[in-house]
């Protein structure tokens, strides 16, 4: 008996590393020291920083992986993984530095795994961060054959005096919503139940334009790092930011609001994508659950002074991100939790 007969193919692992090497190295920034194969990834801080703060985040893709693996779509979930981590850390105004990934599978499928890593590398390039290292664990008997799970870890950096922590937010500020690409990577346990109820498959289409349902559900999560860095470098005054993930607007926008502030949202200020209407109708999902599960077309929020709202929206559109003024900050009794008016509580 040997390791391969026990379910772990070391040679396939080596071939996999060689296949992904070029994609990984293409993400490297000038600060990266060394290459693949070491026990740890090495990277220096960007030159010229005065008082840098490191910002870290970790996340996964959830049960979107189940749907992606059923339909042989692997590259997109790699982008999703980067987006779920990077979109969190950039809310502080930090620029992504490096990313690490962890993949676990029952049996290494080099082609599928390579597609995932190539997607991760794609997301890293779009976000300006280096894919500094990773781990692929082959765990026969623990994961089902042909199934894998992935997790990501991101570190970003911001000057201490440029940190955006929401403390400058005040009543009267404007809330700008930046468009999502669709469901992103949250709510897929509910999505999969709706698909099951509707007997949907790879050939199912929806909406007036008869769009491919599965294709739209698996659209990669939008990356906002380049947009945020552009806004900061353009001198836009950003008081706060929120990544709209699980819990939707009602549970994520309040996370960036300081004590004494709430927000009023105008749900008619943007057009809810047809995909969410299909999910609601096919699954008979109550309106409140829809708001507290999905992003409903808003993947990221920017809180800015009212005088800056038009300029910020124009900057967003100039970077190919659709954006709308969706609400404003209101006052709240100190000590009370921030709430959103205009959406189901």
From Swiss-Prot:
CDD domains cross-referenced by the UniProt entry: PurM
Keywords attached to this entry: ATP-binding, Cytoplasm, Ligase, Nucleotide-binding, Purine biosynthesis
InterPro entries, per database record: PurM-like_C_dom (IPR010918), PurM-like_C_sf (IPR036676), PurM-like_N (IPR016188), PurM-like_N_sf (IPR036921), PurM_cligase (IPR004733)
Entries under SUPFAM superfamilies matching the protein: PurM C-terminal domain-like (SSF56042), PurM N-terminal domain-like (SSF55326)
GO cellular component terms given for this protein: cytosol
NCBIfam families in the cross-refs: purM (TIGR00878)
Protein name in UniProt: Phosphoribosylformylglycinamidine cyclo-ligase
Organism for this UniProt entry: Synechococcus sp. (strain CC9605)
């Amino acid at each position: 008996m040997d390791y391969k007969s026990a379910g772990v193919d070391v040679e396939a692992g080596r071939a996999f590393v060689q296949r992904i090497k070029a994609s990984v190295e293409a993400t490297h920034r000038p600060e990266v020291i060394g290459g693949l194969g070491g026990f740890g990834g090495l990277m220096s801080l960007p030159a010229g920083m005065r008082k840098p703060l490191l910002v870290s985040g970790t996340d996964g893709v959830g049960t979107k992986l189940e749907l992606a693996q059923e339909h042989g779509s692997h590259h997109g979930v790699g982008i999703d993984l980067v987006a779920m981590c990077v979109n969190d850390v950039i809310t502080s105004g930090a620029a992504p530095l490096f990313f690490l990934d962890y993949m676990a599978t029952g049996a290494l499928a080099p082609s599928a795994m390579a597609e995932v890593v190539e997607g991760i590398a794609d997301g890293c390039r779009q976000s300006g961060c280096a894919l500094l290292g990773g781990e692929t664990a082959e765990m026969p008997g623990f994961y089902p054959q042909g199934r894998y799970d992935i997790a990501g870890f991101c570190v970003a950096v911001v000057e201490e005096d440029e940190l955006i922590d929401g403390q400058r937010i005040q009543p009267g500020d404007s809330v700008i919503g930046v468009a999502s690409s669709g469901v992103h990577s949250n709510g897929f346990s509910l999505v999969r139940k709706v698909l099951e109820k509707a007997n949907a498959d790879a050939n199912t289409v929806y909406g007036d334009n008869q769009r491919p349902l599965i294709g739209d559900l698996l659209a990669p999560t939008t990356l906002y790092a380049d947009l945020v860095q552009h806004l900061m470098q353009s001198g836009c005054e950003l008081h706060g930011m929120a990544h709209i993930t699980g819990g939707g607007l009602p549970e994520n926008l309040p996370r960036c609001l300081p004590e004494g502030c709430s927000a009023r949202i105008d749900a008619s200020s943007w057009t809810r994508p047809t995909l969410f209407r299909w999910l609601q109708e096919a699954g008979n999902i109550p309106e409140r659950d829809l708001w507290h599960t999905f992003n409903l077309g808003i993947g990221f929020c920017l809180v800015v002074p009212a005088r800056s709202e038009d300029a910020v929206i124009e900057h967003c559109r100039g970077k190919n991100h659709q954006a709308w003024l969706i609400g404003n900050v209101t006052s709240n009794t100190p000590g009370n939790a921030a709430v959103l008016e205009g959406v189901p509580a």
